[in-house]
């Protein structure tokens, strides 16, 4: 069965990913035919955003099982599982998707296993879109009429199964006519804000103004921002949140200026196994991502570089976490546990 979204197309016998490294100047779709290609696409930023990474990994494992045919079993798939799990260590949705597939597949083998994995990967894809649409409505309820919001990185349809997390809230608020506009930080070093978020919002007709990351404090000081809305790659049991590098800076600035700081993420991004943010593994990426921009060197060749892909925002700085199940106000361990318990009951 074909399942399509803005950046991910499942065609039954292969996967197509929109190469987000080429946007906004070029639209290029890449064919993904096995787990190694899926892992490479995740690692090399062809696809990014925690939900989209989880969806891609699920399809990648299903493809590997198809290739194995009658030899497919959870034991023979372990190398593929390890390869996919190693592709981006911070995004918990990746591990969640692989663990879910294992539970769903059970003791199946051969073609029955391959079919089951494909079915559940499709379900993960569809469920993410529905979750984002619900999240958008819950999050829009938190915004005042006429708000202008600030967002960081890209959390839209390109980063998910559709609609988006933080950008989904923005889309839903715009549909309600309660949003005035959006400031999008450029998000160095990969420029997801300038290349992807501005592209998505402009295509939707939502007023967006692109700014340098270092402009956020001035905008808040001038009273031009009524809320900051970001996504998440992992949220620990106490509400500490890993997200794109620069998110922590925004949370500190928002608290200083008494501006709501809202995190949007599906329940699959919550990781109750980790008590707090100090336990999150932070991915460090290649130094040349900072030294160079689109292949052009902007720094001395041998200058040392520190390039973490994510930072940790303490729960104390977060006004609310929005999931598809509702809103966790001023998150802490007890509130996160209660939210997860309600999710299990429903």
Curated annotation (Swiss-Prot):
Signal peptide annotation: none
UniProt xrefs under InterPro entries: IF-2B-related, IF-M1Pi, IF_2B-like_C, Initiation_fac_2B_a/b/d, M1Pi_N, NagB/RpiA_transferase-like
Pathway given in the UniProt record: Amino-acid biosynthesis; L-methionine biosynthesis via salvage pathway; L-methionine from S-methyl-5-thio-alpha-D-ribose 1-phosphate: step 1/6
Record's catalysed reaction(s): 5-(methylsulfanyl)-alpha-D-ribose 1-phosphate = 5-(methylsulfanyl)-D-ribulose 1-phosphate
Catalytic site: 233
Key word Isomerase present: yes
Entry EC no(s): 5.3.1.23
Keywords: Amino-acid biosynthesis, Isomerase, Methionine biosynthesis
Record-marked site positions (Transition state stabilizer): 153
Keyword Isomerase in annotation: yes
Highest taxon listed in the record's lineage: Bacteria
Record-listed substrate binding positions: 48-50, 88, 192, 243-244
GO BP of this protein: L-methionine salvage from methylthioadenosine
Pfam families, A to Z: IF-2B
Example GO molecular function: S-methyl-5-thioribose-1-phosphate isomerase activity
Catalytic class of the enzyme: isomerase
Function of the protein: Catalyzes the interconversion of methylthioribose-1-phosphate (MTR-1-P) into methylthioribulose-1-phosphate (MTRu-1-P).
Family, similarity comment: Belongs to the eIF-2B alpha/beta/delta subunits family. MtnA subfamily.
NCBIfam families: eIF-2B_rel, PRK05720.1, salvage_mtnA
Name of the protein in its database record: Methylthioribose-1-phosphate isomerase
UniProt source species: Alcanivorax borkumensis (strain ATCC 700651 / DSM 11573 / NCIMB 13689 / SK2)
Lineage of source species: Bacteria, Pseudomonadati, Pseudomonadota, Gammaproteobacteria, Oceanospirillales
Gene transcribed to yield this protein: mtnA
């Amino acid at each position: 069965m074909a399942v399509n979204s803005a950046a991910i197309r499942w065609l039954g016998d292969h996967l197509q990913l929109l190469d987000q490294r080429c946007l906004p100047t070029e639209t290029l779709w890449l064919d993904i035919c096995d787990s190694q290609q899926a892992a490479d696409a995740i690692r090399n930023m062809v696809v990014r955003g925690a939900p989209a990474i989880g969806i891609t990994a699920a399809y990648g494992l299903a493809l590997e099982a198809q290739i194995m045919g009658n030899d497919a079993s959870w034991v023979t798939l372990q190398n593929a599982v390890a390869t996919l799990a190693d592709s981006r260590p911070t995004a918990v949705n990746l591990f969640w998707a692989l663990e879910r597939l294992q539970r769903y597949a059970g003791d199946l083998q051969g073609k029955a296993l391959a079919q089951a994995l494909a079915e559940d990967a499709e379900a993960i894809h569809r469920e993410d879109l529905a979750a984002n649409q619900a999240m958008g409505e819950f999050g829009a309820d938190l915004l005042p009429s006429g708000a202008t919001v600030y967002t960081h990185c890209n959390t839209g349809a390109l980063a998910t199964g559709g609609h988006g997390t933080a950008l989904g809230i923005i889309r839903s608020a715009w549909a309600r006519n309660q949003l005035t506009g959006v400031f999008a930080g450029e998000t160095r070093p990969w420029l997801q804000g300038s290349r992807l978020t501005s592209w998505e919002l402009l295509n939707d007709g939502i007023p967006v103004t692109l700014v340098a990351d270092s402009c956020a404090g001035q905008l808040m000081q001038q009273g031009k921002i009524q809320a900051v809305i970001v996504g998440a790659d992992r949220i620990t049991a106490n509400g500490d949140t890993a997200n794109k590098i620069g998110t922590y800076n925004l949370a500190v600035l928002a608290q200083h200026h008494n501006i709501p700081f809202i995190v949007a993420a599906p329940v699959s991004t919550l990781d109750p196994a980790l008590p707090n943010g100090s336990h999150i593994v932070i991915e460090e990426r290649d130094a040349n991502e900072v030294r160079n921009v689109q292949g052009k060197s902007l720094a001395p060749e041998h200058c040392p570089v520190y390039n973490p892909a994510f930072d940790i925002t303490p729960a104390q700085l977060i006004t609310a976490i929005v999931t598809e199940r509702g809103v966790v106000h001023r998150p802490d361990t007890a509130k996160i546990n209660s939210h997860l318990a309600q999710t299990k009951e429903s």
